[in-house]
């Protein structure tokens, strides 16, 4: 009887493991964009390395001036981050492990520590191809974007009615309305909304 119970537990565990591996997920909070949004989608190993947590970690190790760092090109910044966190020190932080995990999942060799070879991999892919690879590798069905109507780079794309990859779902970012009303209400008014700085009933209704 005990063996039967153990067998059922093992069977259930196998079913759960298989289901988790096979199910397609929806990521409900991302800062990703479809290829139709052009340079708003940050991709490639240099962008991967220029993650703000990795930048902060680099400043703790590297003897580099803050202003000098931000005057570097993206490639130069990535070179410094890679050298500091992955070559001169053991990449043991969660952020560093995330980079190594991505490289491994893409079929690249993290152990080679060869940044140029990783760059060649991305250079050989189009943005659309890489998006497909990420969705397939991560088992994603769709992702929810974070869309800011007050972003002057993003808003014109929506106003143009750009056709986008259906796997990218829109979600309106309203932080500026709640936190920076003194700056956002004049913009809303210039776009034709009947609003005032004072939160009148009419403004709230609009």
Regions found by a protein language model. Give the residues of each.
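Metal-cofactor-binding active-site regions of metalloenzymes
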Residues: 2-26, 30-206
């Amino acid at each position: 009887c005990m063996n039967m119970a153990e067998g059922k537990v093992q069977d259930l565990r196998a079913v759960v493991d298989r289901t988790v591996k096979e199910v397609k997920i929806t990521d409900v909070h991302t800062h990703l964009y479809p290829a139709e949004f052009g340079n708003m989608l940050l991709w490639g190993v240099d962008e991967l390395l220029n993650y703000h947590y990795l930048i902060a970690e680099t400043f703790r190790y590297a003897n580099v001036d803050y202003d000098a760092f931000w005057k570097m090109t993206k490639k130069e910044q990535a070179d410094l981050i890679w050298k500091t966190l992955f070559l001169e020190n053991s990449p043991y932080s969660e952020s560093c492990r995330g980079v190594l995990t991505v490289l491994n999942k893409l079929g690249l060799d993290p152990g080679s520590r060869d940044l140029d070879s990783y760059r060649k991999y991305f250079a050989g892919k189009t943005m659309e191809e890489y998006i497909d690879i990420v969705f397939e590798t991560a088992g994603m069905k769709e992702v929810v974007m974070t869309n800011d109507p007050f972003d002057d780079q993003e808003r014109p794309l929506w106003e143009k009615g750009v056709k986008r990859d259906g796997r990218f779902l829109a979600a309106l970012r309203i932080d500026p309305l709640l936190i920076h009303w003194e700056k956002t209400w004049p913009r809303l008014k210039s776009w034709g909304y009947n609003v005032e700085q004072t939160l009148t009933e009419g403004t709230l209704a609009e």
